[in-house]
């Protein structure tokens, strides 16, 4: 595989709402971060089956991208950074304890702690249960609960990354196709597991549930402008943007972003022909 720096495709578009139609959104996880999405291990790809028997979850996304028509552009962006455990100073912790109850909020925990708490609750090891509680002695986990515990423990055992996913569909009015929006928003459904899934962030989606929510259209115009600017700047983790990221581990990231295998082919996305050769004898080391 040869990796080269690609030209920034976002610089080729000057967004003008009078000439270009735009639809976009950000994605987040439906459940708490420790609950995993469906990964390549769940698809059985780690068993190294023959190419013709592989079911690569990224295939449907590539097929969709290959199906868009003339004058249409679909952008998909995944931003990551190494997850840092959330640390607070002592005085801030005490302040949060004071205001937590009246406002019904909760202090943010790091990813591993959150996952361990989920497991502890399911194992009846949290503070609400005492050691001499007869309920614990009679407690038997169901098969589904055991699988959930194993999945969460497997997820938090791997390095986590703060993640942001953003998608945009652009086209001139004559080429704008609503069915392309459906395909774009459905391109992450193959990662849905019994525990978690991707879902659009309503306040970051360029749409409103009812006309009365934006009668003049000014809020929608502002959302589109903001989403486009955030996309081209790869903005997300800075505090000023006030967007809560979620966490995916290395297994999950490798599932949603990887080089597609040779079995994934589409007529409109041809592969570059290449062959392996020995390195030149004068290659500096």
What are these regions (language model features)?
Residues 1-285:
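Extended, folded cores of ATP/NTP-driven motor/assembly subunits in large transport
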């Amino acid at each position: 595989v040869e990796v080269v720096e690609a030209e920034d495709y976002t610089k080729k578009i000057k967004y003008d709402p009078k000439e270009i139609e735009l639809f976009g959104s950000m994605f987040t996880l439906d459940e708490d971060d420790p609950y995993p999405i469906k990964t390549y291990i769940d698809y059985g790809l780690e068993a190294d089956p023959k190419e013709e028997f592989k079911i690569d979850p990224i295939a449907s996304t590539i097929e969709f991208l290959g199906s868009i028509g003339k004058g249409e552009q679909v952008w998909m962006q995944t931003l990551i950074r190494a997850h840092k455990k959330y640390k607070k100073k002592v005085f801030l912790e005490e302040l949060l304890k004071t205001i937590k109850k009246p406002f019904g909020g909760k202090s943010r925990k790091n990813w591993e702690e959150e996952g361990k708490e989920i497991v502890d609750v399911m194992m009846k090891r949290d503070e609400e249960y005492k050691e001499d509680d007869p309920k614990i002695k009679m407690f038997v986990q169901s098969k589904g609960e055991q699988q959930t515990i194993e999945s969460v423990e497997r997820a938090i055992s791997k390095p986590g990354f703060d993640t942001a996913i953003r998608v945009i569909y652009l086209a001139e009015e004559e080429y704008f196709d609503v069915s392309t929006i459906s395909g774009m928003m459905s391109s992450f459904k193959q990662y849905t597991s019994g525990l978690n899934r991707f879902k659009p962030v309503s306040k970051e989606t360029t749409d409103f549930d009812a006309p009365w929510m934006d009668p003049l259209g000014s809020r929608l115009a502002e959302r589109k402008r903001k989403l486009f600017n955030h996309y081209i700047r790869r903005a997300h983790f800075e505090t000023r943007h006030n967007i809560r990221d979620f966490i995916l581990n290395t297994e999950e990231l490798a599932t949603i972003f990887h080089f597609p295998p040779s079995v994934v082919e589409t007529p409109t996305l041809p592969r570059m022909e290449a062959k392996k050769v020995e390195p030149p004898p004068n290659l500096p080391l």
